[in-house]
Structures are given as structure tokens and as C-alpha cells.
Amino acid sequence: MMRLGVFLLLLLPTVLGIYGCSNASDYTSENPNAAFFYPLDSIPKIYLYRDVSSGLDEEFHRIYTVKDQEGPHLIVEIYASDGRIKEAFNYNIDSLNLQDYMVVDVNQEKEKALLYKDKLFPMHLNERTWFAAKFKGVVDSTVMLSEVKRQFKRKENHLVMEDEEPTLVFSDLMRLTVLNPFTKKEEAKQTTRISYFADGYGLVEWHSINKKVHYRLEQVLTQQEWIKIITR
């Protein structure tokens, strides 16, 4: 039943893309760094990332644009290797700021997070972006605050699958705080991640400082290829 539901979820943006959008050239961003962000295409693309430190763990990012009464925006859905959706980011195409952020708990219940700071991708490379969102915690009565502060480090040519591509490299300071509003107690964990955004692709690689976690883009799948994987 869950896989049928996922299949219908995957099918909907394809139908919207056919009837609601003409082609990818309909969408342009005012962000001067948009070439290094995800393609603004109404036809969904699925990025398969593999954890090269272990060679086993996979993660899928499903990327597509839609247009509604609020205008065009880009959706990035994050899936675990078993097909469970984990979170989804909704970006405004003009600025590439976040419009919405959705989280999914272990029971696959979706929650629209409360967005405090909406910048994950910079308009200008000399700015430090700040993303902050609050949502329900794993334990009853707790809430979680997720933050990412991103700083541009350098531009380089980087290997993306089999080709060298111009790439923006960022340092991401990531902080997750668990808050109990009744006891006023909080517990925070912080880490630093290095992220790589390549021209024409968007996010192609990320790793922790010690590279114990290290994901790299391995393949770009079509919608049909993705459906075969997720429903088999």
C-alpha cells in the first residue's frame, strides 16, 4: 500500500508537468548563481547519491518545478534508499530562497515546519546564508530546531560523474537542537559539512570534515527509471 501511494505521489508532478508547463525555458531565476543550482525543469529528475565511504548507503533527491497561483517554484524531495520520503524543500525560483520546508517522521506523517530563516543558497557569494526551521521532535512534547549556516569557500573544477565541471564549494555549519518547552531544557548537536554545487547540476557531493560520511552523485535517473526502482 505504501509503495502504491508513493507511485501516485511520483506520478502527479509528471501530469502537472505535461499539462501545466511547456518546457524548462519557461523558468529563469534572478539569482546570479542559479547556474550552480538544480536545473529548473518541469520534468522530474532523480539524483542517485551513494555514500562512497561505505559503498552501500544510497539517497535519492527528486527534483522538479511546478507552477501554481503563487508562481513557479522548485521542489527537492529527499528519499531514503528504501523509498521513504524524509523531507522536502520548496524553493522560490526568482530568489532561490525557501518558501516551505516539510519533514516526515518515522511513521511517514508529514509536517510543514515553521520556517524562521529561509536562505540555503546564496544570492551573492560573499553572504553567509542562514536556514532555520522548527518542527515536532521524536519524543512527545519536544520540538526540534534545525539550522544550516552556509559560507562560500572557493570555486573549482570538480569531477562530476565522468566530467570536470565548474563547482562552488561551501562550508555548512549544521546545528540540531532538541527543545522541551515545559522543562526549558535543550540539547544541541553541531557538525560541519562541505557541499559541492556544480554548474548545470546543483548539489553533486557532500561530506563531513573527516569524510566518514561522504555522498557523491552517481547517476541521474528519469522518472520512469525511478518508478521501476521504487515499486519493485
Stretches found by the model and what they are:
Residues M1-V6:
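Positively charged n-region of N-terminal signal peptides that target proteins for export
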